[in-house]
Amino acid sequence: MPVIPALGEAKGEVLPPGDTTTIIPLNWMLKSPPGHFGLLLLLSQQAKNGVMVLAGVTDPEYQDEISLLLHNEGHLKEVKMEGARLGLPGRAESLEHQVQSHLNMIAQSQRTFQKKDAGKAIILSKLTQEQKTKHCMFSLH
């Protein structure tokens, strides 16, 4: 199984139990090209312990040190983050590419749906391009 490169590693931080939030600095900066964004994710090991990223998206204008805002939903135990791989990079694709990809998926779904049930397809075909784009933008957040 390939090892996913991490952008940072926890240095002994502990997330106390009971809906607590901690900021973990990663000691690096990210410069995204225009129209791109950074997506910081945790591995499933942390998710199984009830840890989640509260703010994991960086925009191209943000130029300061990256930190992860982690939240421990686990009410029964503290989570030791030492050595945990943090800040895994997401796919570096432009926002425009993501929107176009979603629009293509909607168009394909619409064509498939029209073949299966022509009566209900009228509802989908009434969506304007603006509504489709708004739906896609919402699904990216």
UniProtKB/Swiss-Prot annotation:
GO MF annotations, alphabetized: dUTP diphosphatase activity; magnesium ion binding
Listed name of the protein: Putative inactive deoxyuridine 5'-triphosphate nucleotidohydrolase-like protein FLJ16323
UniProt-listed Gene3D superfamilies: 2.70.40.10
Stretch forming the signal peptide: none
SUPFAM superfamilies: dUTPase-like
Similarity comment: Belongs to the dUTPase family.
One example of a Gene Ontology biological process annotation: dUTP catabolic process
